[in-house]
Curated annotation (Swiss-Prot):
Matching PANTHER family: 3-OXO-TETRONATE 4-PHOSPHATE DECARBOXYLASE-RELATED, FUCULOSE PHOSPHATE ALDOLASE
The gene coding this protein: mtnB
Domain of life assignment: Bacteria
This protein's name: Methylthioribulose-1-phosphate dehydratase
NCBIfam families: salvage_mtnB
Source species: Parvibaculum lavamentivorans (strain DS-1 / DSM 13023 / NCIMB 13966)
GO BP term (any one): pentose catabolic process
Length: 204
């Protein structure tokens, strides 16, 4: 179901995600961006250049999901808006640059995915009820043309996948959920799982 939030409510969710990531060092040097769907037409989105660790409502804009450009929108806004258009059940999206996600996105770029398998914390993802499975996190090559990159991402993603995120090679991680609260849970789970995966691979 598509949410029905006013701008102030949606902005609170954006701020919560941004500060959560900022407090953990996942959005260094003003990187990263966060959004919350308001309805079928609009989303609240971090403005370009905002310090995510100290974000307030002045650093959040209202963007049209159809894709009309906002003068303060981040260059990566098209990646958020394309996900909202493709999947009405998505209520919030985060983009962060955690160390493990960024390193693994380069290490596995040639295979096109990072495989998580057997980790108990995969059950933090919505719809996952067992550790006894594998989840492939797709990796797409980076591109400074973010409209083209957004189209590539949507072409690459498996619409039936249970994985609530994807990686951009050498860049970072996109994560989503039905709400800001669920997205925060997914962010924390991804960071733990990718850190565990990186440690395990490095120990081999």
């Amino acid at each position: 179901m598509v949410p029905r939030l006013d701008f102030a409510e949606a902005a609170k969710g954006v701020i919560a995600m941004a500060r959560f990531a900022g407090a953990r060092g996942w959005v260094p040097a003003t990187s990263g961006n966060f959004s919350v769907r308001m309805n079928e037409l609009s989303a609240a989105l971090t403005a370009t250049g905002a310090n995510k660790a100290e974000l307030d409502e002045n650093g959040v804009i209202e963007a049209e999901i159809a894709g009309a450009k906002h003068p303060r929108a981040s260059a990566e806004a098209p990646l958020h808006l394309a996900r909202y258009r493709a999947a009405p059940g998505i209520g919030a999206i985060s983009h962060m640059h955690s160390m493990a996600a960024t390193v693994l996105s380069r290490r596995h770029a040639g295979t096109g995915a990072v495989r998580l398998e057997g980790w108990e914390l995969m059950k933090a993802f919505a719809g996952v009820t067992t550790h006894d499975m594998s989840i492939d996190i797709p990796i797409v090559p980076n591109d400074q043309d973010t409209d083209r990159l957004a189209a590539l991402v949507e072409e690459r993603l498996d619409k039936d996948s249970i994985c609530p995120g994807y990686l951009i090679a050498g860049h970072g991680l996109y994560v989503w959920g039905a709400s800001a609260a669920e997205t925060i849970r997914h962010m924390e789970a991804f960071d733990f799982l990718l850190t565990a995966q990186l440690h395990e691979e490095s120990a081999r």
